[in-house]
Each structure stands twice: as C-alpha cells, then as structure tokens.
Amino acid sequence: MNKKYFVLIVCIIFTSALFPTFSSVTAAQGEAVIATDEMNVRSGPGLSYGITAEVKKGERYPILKEDGDWVQIQLGSGEKGWVVSWLITKEDQASTSSSGSSDTVTSTDPDLRMRSGPGTSYEVIGKFPQGSQASVIDKDSGWIKISYHSATGWVSSEYVTSGGSSSASDESDQTEDSGASTTGTVGVSSLNVRASASHDAAIITKLDRGTKLTVLNEKNGWAHIEVNGLKGWVASHYLLTSSVPADDSANAGSSSSAKKAYIMYGGTNLRSDASTSASIVERAAKGDSYTITGSKGSWYEIKLDNGQTAYVANWVVQTSKSAEEAGEPPVSDSPSGNGSLNNKTIIVDPGHGGKDSGTIGYSGKFEKNLTIKTAKLLASKLRSAGADVYVTRQDDTFVSLQSRVSTSHYRNADAFISIHYDSYADTSTRGSTAYYYSPAKDQELASDVHSEVVKRSSIPDRGVLFGDYYVLRENRQPAMLYELGYVSHPQEEAIVHSNSYQEKVTDGIESGLEKYFQ
C-alpha cells in the first residue's frame, strides 16, 4: 500500500512539473501589434478584470493564447496580460521574422529626427543621420518605426530609402547625360533634390531660392542637375535655365513679361468657370504651363493651347514672371482659406485585405486588390490638393473593422471614405452605390461625393442609400462607404479595372469632397 502511494505522489509531482513546459511550448502564436494610441492590459479576458499595464501604438508582443475577443500577450517585464483583439493587428511569427531580417531603410537626411510616435506632434527622442541604416519594425501612414543603435522610434518615410544606401550619383551614373549642359537658378524658396526622376523618390537634399546649378539633362519634366559635386533630379519647371552664365540667368528669365501658371499636380482639372462645380474643360499634366489672362476670386483665368479660356485654382499652381517673382509653393502665398481640402484630415479605407479577399469578380479577381488600387490613387490626388490623408492599409494585410474605425477617431477625421466593389448572384446587376448611416452626420458627405462621381462614371447610378455597416455605424466622424461597381457583372468588372475608370471615379471623389468642404 505504501509503495502505491509513493508511486502516485511521484506521478503527481512529475505531471505538475510538465505543465509549465507544455504551456511555454504551445504559447507562440505570432505577434500582436498594437493598433490604437493607448490600450489597457487586463489581468483576464474581459472588461471586469483589473488593469495591470498600458501599451502603446506600434508596440509588438508575443501572443500566448486567445479567448473569444481577447488575446493574451507576453509583456516585456515578463508579465502576461489580456488585450482586446480588434485593437491589435496579428502577424504570423514566421513572416514577421523573415521580413524583419531583410527590411531595412537608409536615411537620406543629415538631420532626420526620430520620434516617439508616428507624427510631428510626438516627442523627438533622437536622430537618424544621413547614410545610416536601420531595421524596420512597423509602418503607419507615411511613418516608419525603426530600430537604430538599440533605440526604437518613428521617422518620416519621405526621408528614407528602402534597403541599402544609395546616392544620387549612383542613380545618375545610369543616365546618359547630353553633352551640352546649361546653367540654372532655383526659382522657389525650397526645392527638393531627389534620387531619381519621380516624386516618390527619396529626397537627397534641398536647395534654397537663387542657388546656381548645372542642368545635365532633362526628361519628362525632370532636370538632372549637379550642384557642389552632388547630382540629383528636380522638377524642371521650378528652375530658371539659360545657356548663358548662371549670373545672367535672372536677366534671361525676365525676357518674358507674361505671367505663367505652372501645374504642380498631375491630373489637375481646368474648368469652364471659377468653381469646383463647373464642368471640366481639360485635365493638365504636372509641369504644364499656361498664360494667365486674369483672376476671379481664388482662381486664375488661363489661355489654353487652342485659344479657349479656362480656370484653374490658384492653390494647385505655381506662378512666375521673373527670377524675383518665381512662384512660392501655393500654400505659402495663397490667401488663408483657399482650397477647401487644405489641412482637412481624410481617412481613405480600402476594403478587405489579407485573409479577407472580399468578393471575387466574374473573372476570379479579388476585390481587395482593386480597393487598394483605387485608395492609393485617391490618396495621392487628395494629398496633392492639400489634404492630410491616412490610408487604413498600405498593402495586402488584414485590418479589423474596429481598427479602421479607431483610426478615424484617433485622427479626428473630417471625412472617412471606405472603398468597396459589389457583387450579386444575378450577374446582370450593375452600378455604383453610396452608403451613409447617420442622416445628420453622413448623408451630405455621401450625396456630395456621389453626385460628382456619377457625372464622370459610365456605369449606372444606384443612388445614395442607408447602409448599416460597422465602419459607418460605429464611426463618430462623417463617413461613407462607396460600392464603385459590380465585379460580378462581366462587362462592368472590365470597366472598373480600367485605368480610365479609376481616374474618373477618384477625380469624382476628390471633387465631391471639395464640394462637401466648401
């Protein structure tokens, strides 16, 4: 009998010793990335449990286990705690480690500041010098969280390049410059020099007004320049160029007394009258120039190549007449209040993503890939018009509905636009539909935007309707959800995927937002 009791006690001790080991082995289930500004960590899976810690946006913690809408995480202190699942982004541990090992950025700014959060309002915690490399931890709407010299912080994505360091000279070596160079003078207060001929390229340095430089080559509205031994690319319409020595460039530039309007953003609308509701006569490309023949409020009257008169908003052009009058960026020399989108915070929400493919089109294409295409094009146009734009997902990742709404609240959005495409079992169904939830808060936004889109769209108008969608119902900010066509309809699927349609609907949404904010 005593021997049996002894064996039983040994078994109990052995089993007890196994439990912690078993728990730690099965614990790893990826990482939780905090998706809201601040979040409470609780001692158990529910709001009734006590708060034990607080975590901040962008921080990462190993996931231990899940219980309904709650996730248990491993804190850095060795403690464990529970957080709500809809305020985190889950990342697979394998993909996180593989991307982390190769995803690096290089600073292109000699004085790039690291901040405690993704925005200029956050505290400066250090510097990321030009040429230095760092590992990427997270990304958020134009900001990148990096690990640099054992410190972590956020830097603006505008001043870093992906991967190893590259310089403008590396880029320029691949360009065949013409033998005949010209001299030029910077005609704006601050001119970005970029690593390649693109507005998406990294900024290498900035040049002040009046800086003399050599123009080596020009292509597609960009000038390949050299200044003080540094080579790079600048938008050519910001330069006053001449084949005479640089000292005489101001005189050469003043030979034309007619004041010109230089288009700063691709796809700028030229209208029949001085109003965003006026019909569009023509769309101008970035760098196009027109003679200014008059003004009307905050609009310039311009003369088109065919002799016709049109109007362009003065906040989307640069004007120049001589070196002394080379136009400032429009925000700085436009009167206060010009441009209804200026400084408006707009959330662009591409529906679905990651494991959520959305609907599947007639040809088998996923909705999630089309929504982000539309969202990125729209965001680019809204930024060009002066808006502060945040996109809820930048790539093919899953973002919860709660996180999308949380972004709207956190950014105190002036407007939230959720982009979707529709489908139906009856493949003859087609058309675009704008949805709102609150008549008082949302309906005007949906109506203004939809009215401008249908002017440009070639597909049927299904109207502005009430929609009980989470991103509308739970959103405290003005919000709309846009179904921009039926991908279950074979012809309409081809239409909505076309570049022409994408340009038209994003133009319409931009114009509708301008109308809404007037």
UniProtKB/Swiss-Prot annotation:
Which Gene Ontology terms of cellular component type are present? Answer: extracellular region
What spans are recorded as compositionally biased (Low complexity)? 95-108, 160-169
Q: Which residues form the SH3b domain?
A: 29-91, 102-164, 181-243, 258-320
**Which reaction is this enzyme known to catalyze?**
Hydrolyzes the link between N-acetylmuramoyl residues and L-amino acid residues in certain cell-wall glycopeptides
Looking up CDD domains in the UniProt record yields: MurNAc-LAA
Q: What is this protein called?
A: Putative N-acetylmuramoyl-L-alanine amidase YrvJ
Q: Where in the cell is it found?
A: Secreted, Cell wall
Concerning PANTHER family, the annotation shows: N-ACETYLMURAMOYL-L-ALANINE AMIDASE LYTC (PTHR30032:SF1), N-ACETYLMURAMOYL-L-ALANINE AMIDASE-RELATED (PTHR30032)
One Pfam family, please name it. SH3_3
EC number(s) on record?
A: 3.5.1.28
Entry's family note: Belongs to the N-acetylmuramoyl-L-alanine amidase 3 family.
Q: Write out the biased-composition intervals (Polar residues).
A: 333-345
Q: Where does this protein come from, organism-wise?
A: Bacillus subtilis (strain 168)
Q: Which residues form the MurNAc-LAA domain?
A: 346-514
Q: Where is this region: Disordered?
A: 94-121, 160-186, 322-352
GO process annotations (BP): cell wall organization; peptidoglycan catabolic process
Job of this protein: Probably involved in cell-wall metabolism.
Its keywords, alphabetically, are: Cell wall, Cell wall biogenesis/degradation, Hydrolase, Metal-binding, Secreted, Signal, Zinc
In the record, which residues are listed under signal peptide? 1-27
- The enzyme class is hydrolase
The record lists the lineage as:
Bacteria, Bacillati, Bacillota, Bacilli, Bacillales
Give this protein's Gene Ontology molecular function annotations: metal ion binding; N-acetylmuramoyl-L-alanine amidase activity
PROSITE patterns per the UniProt record, alphabetical: SH3B (PS51781)
